[in-house]
Swiss-Prot record:
It is an enzyme of class 2 (transferase). It catalyses: L-tyrosyl-[protein] + ATP = O-phospho-L-tyrosyl-[protein] + ADP + H(+). It comes from Mus musculus. The lineage of its organism: Eukaryota, Metazoa, Chordata, Craniata, Vertebrata. This is Macrophage colony-stimulating factor 1 receptor. Monomer. Homodimer. Interacts with CSF1 and IL34. Interaction with dimeric CSF1 or IL34 leads to receptor homodimerization. Interacts with INPPL1/SHIP2 and THOC5. Interacts (tyrosine phosphorylated) with PLCG2 (via SH2 domain). Interacts (tyrosine phosphorylated) with PIK3R1 (via SH2 domain). Interacts (tyrosine phosphorylated) with FYN, YES1 and SRC (via SH2 domain). Interacts (tyrosine phosphorylated) with CBL, GRB2 and SLA2. Residues 540-572 are annotated as: Regulatory juxtamembrane domain. The juxtamembrane domain functions as autoinhibitory region. Phosphorylation of tyrosine residues in this region leads to a conformation change and activation of the kinase. It is found in: Cell membrane. Widely expressed.
C-alpha cells in the first residue's frame, strides 16, 4: 500500500547513552495551534533518519547538537506521525511522536488520495484529524453519501486514519471521512481505494542488516523474517551450509502472516563470521537473501582511490578527485585541505560525501582549474581507529610560450629561444629563405633539433622554463630564423629576421614650420579629433547584450558568473540551412530580426514544423555576433523545459548565425492581456477579494496599437510595427487561424491568470535550479503558445533606442528600472532573489490585465526614494488577497525574506486548486466579441514593450490615493546604469 513519499532527513548527531533515540519534547502526542513554531529534536548515538508525511516548511538545523526539525509556521498539513530511527544500530529501535495542528478551518489532513492493496490485506485510508478532540465524532462514508458496506469491518485510528480489515474487491470505492465541528459537519476530500485480487506467490523475505561488521566481543543481531498472505510457509536461517536452531516467532500484521528468526549474539567471535542466508519457502516457491557478517580484531579505517594520486590536467579543465573509505565504526571527522604551494587567490573547496553501509565516498570538485590551484590536496579522516589520510598531487599542463632574442657572444651572433610550458616542450630551429612568417621543414634550408636545451627553472607544480641557443656565426640578410616548440598541450613558434641598415643621406637644413607643414598638421589634428568623436559616439551606441547570468559559485554576497563565450557549443544542435523555408518577418529591431520559418526534418526526417528564427542584420558588429552566439550557447546549456522558449536548433556554419526556437502563436503575454482587456466590461472579483476597491473600474481603455519589441530584435517604433501573426500558406494554416480566432473570443477567467502565473513561476524555478539569473522578468518577455502554455523568453536585452524618444542615454546599458529590485537599482547586485522581486511586478501586470507598473509615477528621484523606503503598489483589481500577499512578499526589501520560486509555485497551485473547486467564482466577462485577435505570432525573442503611462482615469484606479495627483508625463521604463 502506497501512502505517498515519506519525508526523509539525515544528520550526524552527538553521542549519548545507550538505548533508543529520544525525541524532545517528550510524550507520544503534541498539540499546537496554526502559525506556531514547532521544533522536534532527536538525540541518538549516531546518524539518524526522520520519516513522516511530506509537509511544507520543515527545515533541518545542522548546527544543533542533535537532529532537529523546525517549522516556523505550522499548518494543518504538518499533522502526522514523525519517527526518528538510528541508522547504524538496528537493535536500538526508533521513537515516534504524533503532531496535531489544531485548525478549526481544516479538520482533516489527507496523506494520500489513492490507496491500493491486495485482497485480504489491511487497507489504511490516511485521513488524519487535526484536533484529537474530534476522534469521538468521526465516521466513514462512501462517495455520494452512501453507507459503508455492512460486511466491511473497519475502525478509526487518530494516528493512521480509517483502517479496513481484510479488504475485499467489493470494498473498492471512493471514501469520504466525516466529523462534527461545533455542531457542523466537516468532510474530507475523497480517497480512492483499489483492492486487487490476490495471486499466490512465494513468501517475501527480509534479512537485516544487509551487511554487518563487529569488533570481537561486541554484541550483534541478525534478523531473518518472511511474510505471506497464507500461513503455510517456513523460514530458516543458515550460516554457510549449517542450519541454525533459532526459535521461530509468528505474528499477523496488516493482513499478512509474519514469521521471524532472530539470532542475538552478546559477544561475537571469529567463528561467528561468515555468509548468512535467510530462506523462506511454500508450495509456490522459495526465496533466499544473503548477507556477509565480518568480525574484526579492532577498529579500521582504509582510504583508497581508483584514480592515480598524481593527476595532470590542462589549465581551465575540470577535475573530480574521488576517495573511497571503508571504516568501522563510523567516521567522526573528515576534511579536504589544500597544502600549497600557491596560497594566493584560493577559493573555498567544494566537496560532497556519499554514504553507504561501512563505506564512504568523498568527492572534491575542482572546476575550471586555475594556475594557482595546482599543488597537493589532502583528505584526512578519523574514527576510533585513529587518523588516516590520502594526498593527491595536481600538476597543470600549459601550452608552450616562446620568445626569441639575439645577442652577440664572443664576436659571434647567437639566437636565444626562451620557452616555458608543461610538460617540457621540445625545441626545433629552422632557417628559411626570405622574409616570411611561415615555414615548415619542407621549405627550410636547415633544421636543428635541440634535444638538450638548458633548463632554467623546474619548480614542482609550475611551468618548466628552458633556453635553447642557436650559434649562427654571422646573421644572413634576407633570411628568417624560426624557433618552434611543441608539447602534449599545444605548440608555438616565433621568428627572427636580420635587419639590413643602409647608408643615410643628410638632407639640407630647412625650416620645419613652413606654412605647408603647419596646414598638414592642422588637418591631421582635425581628423584625429573627428575620429575620436566618432569612436566616442560608437562606444555610446547601445550594443546587443546578453542579459542572463549563470552563477559559477558564490561566497556570501559575492557572486562569480560564467563567461558565456567560454561555454561549449554542441554540434548536435546544428541544422541544415537548406531545410529552412522562411516566411514573414515577425519583428525587426536595431540589431536583427525574428522570422517565421518552416523547418523540414527537425527531429524526424519527415517532420514539418513551424519555428521562429532569430538572426542578426548584415551590418551587425563582431561583438553583437558574439552576443548572439553566447545566447545560443546558454540556451543549449540550460536544456529543455516546458515553460521556457526552448532551443530547437541552430545554423552556425556557412553563413550568418541563425537561432531556431519554438514558435509561440499567441505572442507575448503583455499584449495578450491587453487585447483581452479591451473586451472587458468590468472586473470579475473572487470571493476573497475586497469588493470596495475601485468598484467603478468598469472598462480598461487601451490604445489600439502597442509598440512590439523584442529586446532590439523586433522594435521599429509605432509606424513600422509588424503585427506578429501566423502566415497562412495552406489550408491547415487557415484552420489554425480559425482556432486562434475562436480562442480570442473566449473571456478570461481568474483561473487563466493563476495558470499564467504558475507556469512562469515553474519556468523561473527551472532557471534558478540551473543557477541562471534572468534579470529582465516581465510580461513582455513571456510568450504564449498553443494551449495557453506560458514560456519565458527574451534572454538578451537590446532595444531600438535610436528611434525611440522614451530612452535617455546615460551610459552603455539600459535597465528595466520599474521591474528591478532595490539592490539591483542601487548596488547593481543581481541574484535569484532579485528575479523574485521582478516576478512580483510581473504578477501585478498579470492581475491588472497589462497595466504599467507604478502607474502615474515617473522614473526620477522621487521614484527611487519610494522604492528605497519600501513603497508597494496597491492591490490590482483582479487579484485575490492571497495573490496580493504573494506580491508583497516578493517585494520585501530584505532579499533573504523573499519566497523562493518553488514556494511561489506551491502557493499558486494551492490557489488554483481552490479556484477550480469553488464554483462561486465567475468568469471575467467579455463584450461578446473580440476587438483584437489572439493570433499574433511569437518567437523566442518576441516581446512587447507597453506604451508609457496613459492619462486615463481608469489606470489610476490601481494607484495609491496619494499618487493620483502625480502628473502623467512621458516616462521611461529603462535607464542607463
Amino acid at each position: 500500500m502506497e501512502l505517498g513519499p515519506p519525508l526523509v532527513l539525515l544528520l550526524a548527531t552527538v553521542w549519548h547513552g545507550q538505548g533508543a533515540p529520544v525525541i524532545e519534547p517528550s510524550g507520544p502526542e503534541l498539540v499546537v495551534e496554526p502559525g506556531e513554531t514547532v521544533t522536534l529534536r532527536c538525540v541518538s548515538n549516531g546518524s539518524v533518519e526522520w520519516d513522516g508525511p511530506i509537509s511544507p516548511y520543515w527545515t533541518l538545523d545542522p548546527e544543533s547538537p542533535g537532529s532537529t526539525l523546525t517549522t516556523r509556521n505550522a499548518t494543518f498539513k504538518n499533522t502526522g506521525t514523525y519517527r526518528c530511527t538510528e541508522l547504524e544500530d538496528p537493535m536500538a529501535g526508533s521513537t515516534t511522536i504524533h503532531l496535531y495542528v489544531k485548525d478549526p478551518a481544516h479538520s482533516w489532513n489527507l496523506l494520500a488520495q489513492e490507496v491500493t492493496v491486495v485482497e485480504g490485506q489491511e487497507a489504511v485510508l490516511p485521513c488524519l484529524i487535526t484536533d484529537p478532540a474530534l476522534k469521538d465524532s468521526v465516521s466513514l462514508m462512501r462517495e455520494g453519501g452512501r453507507q459503508v458496506l455492512r460486511k466491511t469491518v473497519y475502525f478509526f485510528s487518530p494516528w493512521r486514519g480509517f483502517i479496513i480489515r481484510k479488504a475485499k474487491v467489493l470494498d473498492s470505492n471512493t471514501y469520504v471521512c466525516k466529523t462534527m465541528v461545533n455542531g457542523r459537519e466537516s468532510t474530507s476530500t475523497g480517497i480512492w481505494l483499489k483492492v486487487n485480487r490476490v495471486h499466490p506467490e512465494p513468501p517475501q523475505i527480509k534479512l537485516e542488516p544487509s551487511k554487518l561488521v563487529r569488533i570481537r566481543g561486541e554484541a550483534a543481531q541478525i534478523v531473518c523474517s518472511a511474510t505471506n498472505a497464507e500461513v503455510g510457509f517456513n523460514v530458516i536461517l543458515k550460516r554457510g551450509d549449517t542450519k541454525l536452531e533459532i526459535p521461530l516467532n509468528s505474528d499477523f500484521q496488516d493482513n499478512y502472516y509474519k514469521k521471524v528468526r532472530a539470532l542475538s549474539l552478546n559477544a561475537v567471535d571469529f567463528q561467528d563470521a561468515g555468509i548468512y542466508s535467510c530462506v523462506a519457502s511454500n508450495d509456490v516457491g522459495t526465496r533466499t537473501a544473503t548477507m556477509n557478517f565480518q568480525v574484526v580484531e579492532s577498529a579500521y579505517l582504509n582510504l583508497t582511490s581508483e584514480q592515480s594520486l598524481l593527476q595532470e590536467v590542462s589549465v581551465g579543465d575540470s577535475l573530480i578527485l574521488t576517495v573511497h573509505a571503508d571504516a568501522y565504526p563510523s567516521i567522526q571527522h573528515y576534511n579536504w585541505t589544500y597544502l600549497g604551494p600557491f596560497f594566493e587567490d584560493q577559493r573555498k573547496l567544494e566537496f560532497i560525501t556519499q554514504r553507504a553501509i561501512y563505506r564512504y565516498t568523498f568527492k572534491l570538485f575542482l572546476n575550471r582549474v586555475k594556475a594557482s590551484e595546482a599543488g597537493q590536496y589532502f583528505l584526512m579522516a578519523q574514527n576510533k581507529a585513529g587518523w588516516n589520510n590520502l594526498t593527491f598531487e595536481l600538476t597543470l599542463r600549459y601550452p608552450p610560450e616562446v620568445s626569441v632574442t639575439w645577442m652577440p657572444v664572443n664576436g659571434s651572433d647567437v639566437l636565444f629561444c626562451d620557452v616555458s610550458g608543461y610538460p617540457q616542450p621540445s625545441v626545433t630551429w629552422m632557417e628559411c629563405r626570405g622574409h616570411t612568417d611561415r615555414c615548415d621543414e619542407a621549405q627550410a634550408l636547415q633544421v636543428w633539433n635541440d634535444t638538450h636545451p638548458e633548463v632554467l627553472s623546474q619548480k614542482p607544480f609550475d611551468k618548466v622554463i628552458i633556453q635553447s641557443q642557436l650559434p649562427i656565426g654571422t646573421l644572413k640578410h634576407n633570411m628568417t630564423y624560426f624557433c618552434k616548440t611543441h608539447n602534449s598541450v599545444g605548440n608555438s613558434s616565433q621568428y627572427f629576421r636580420a635587419v639590413s641598415l643602409g647608408q643615410s643621406k643628410q638632407l639640407p637644413d630647412e625650416s620645419l614650420f613652413t606654412p605647408v607643414v603647419v596646414a598638414c598638421m592642422s588637418v591631421m589634428s582635425l581628423l584625429v579629433l573627428l575620429l575620436l568623436l566618432l569612436l566616442y559616439k560608437y562606444k555610446q551606441k547601445p550594443k546587443y547584450q546578453v542579459r542572463w547570468k549563470i552563477i559559477e559559485r558564490y561566497e556570501g554576497n559575492s557572486y562569480t558568473f560564467i563567461d558565456p563565450t567560454q561555454l561549449p557549443y554542441n554540434e548536435k544542435w546544428e541544422f541544415p540551412r537548406n531545410n529552412l523555408q522562411f516566411g514573414k518577418t515577425l519583428g525587426a529591431g536595431a540589431f536583427g530580426k525574428v522570422v517565421e520559418a518552416t523547418a523540414f526534418g527537425l527531429g524526424k526526417e519527415d517532420a514539418v514544423l513551424k519555428v521562429a528564427v532569430k538572426m542578426l542584420k548584415s551590418t551587425a558588429h563582431a561583438d553583437e555576433k558574439e552576443a548572439l552566439m553566447s545566447e545560443l550557447k546558454i540556451m543549449s546549456h540550460l536544456g529543455q523545459h516546458e515553460n521556457i522558449v526552448n532551443l530547437l536548433g541552430a545554423c552556425t556554419h556557412g553563413g550568418p548565425v541563425l537561432v531556431i526556437t519554438e514558435y509561440c502563436c499567441y505572442g507575448d503575454l503583455l499584449n495578450f492581456l491587453r487585447r483581452k482587456a479591451e473586451a472587458m466590461l468590468g472586473p470579475s472579483l473572487s470571493p476573497g477579494q475586497d469588493s470596495e476597491g475601485d468598484s467603478s473600474y468598469k472598462n480598461i481603455h487601451l490604445e489600439k496599437k502597442y509598440v512590439r519589441r523584442d529586446s532590439g530584435f523586433s522594435s521599429q517604433g509605432v509606424d513600422t510595427y509588424v503585427e506578429m501573426r501566423p502566415v497562412s500558406t495552406s489550408s491547415s494554416d487557415s484552420f489554425f487561424k480559425q482556432d486562434l480566432d475562436k480562442e480570442a473570443s473566449r473571456p478570461l477567467e481568474l483561473w487563466d491568470l493563476l495558470h499564467f502565473s504558475s507556469q512562469v513561476a515553474q519556468g523561473m524555478a527551472f532557471l534558478a535550479s540551473k543557477n541562471c539569473i534572468h534579470r529582465d522578468v516581465a510580461a513582455r518577455n513571456v510568450l504564449l503558445t498553443s494551449g495557453h502554455v506560458a514560456k519565458i523568453g527574451d534572454f538578451g536585452l537590446a532595444r531600438d533606442i535610436m528611434n525611440d524618444s522614451n530612452y535617455v542615454v546615460k551610459g552603455n546599458a539600459r535597465l528595466p528600472v520599474k521591474w528591478m529590485a532595490p539592490e539591483s537599482i542601487f548596488d547593481c547586485v543581481y541574484t535569484v532573489q532579485s528575479d523574485v522581486w521582478s516576478y512580483g511586478i510581473l504578477l501585478w501586470e498579470i492581475f491588472s490585465l497589462g497595466l504599467n507598473p507604478y502607474p502615474g509615477i515617473l522614473v526620477n528621484n522621487k521614484f527611487y526614494k519610494l522604492v528605497k523606503d519600501g513603497y508597494q503598489m496597491a492591490q490590482p483589481v483582479f487579484a485575490p488577497k492571497n495573490i496580493y500577499s504573494i506580491m508583497q512578499s516578493c517585494w520585501d526589501l530584505e532579499p533573504t525574506r523573499r519566497p523562493t520560486f518553488q514556494q511561489i509555485c506551491f502557493l499558486l497551485q494551492e490557489q488554483a486548486r481552490l479556484e477550480r473547486r469553488d464554483q462561486d467564482y465567475a468568469n471575467l466577462p467579455s463584450s461578446g466579441g473580440s476587438s483584437g485577435s489572439d493570433s499574433g505570432g511569437g518567437s523566442s525573442g518576441g516581446s512587447s514593450s507597453e506604451p508609457e503611462e496613459e492619462s486615463s482615469s481608469e489606470h489610476l484606479a490601481c494607484c495609491e490615493p496619494g499618487d493620483i495627483a502625480q502628473p502623467l508625463l512621458q516616462p521611461n521604463n529603462y535607464q542607463f546604469c
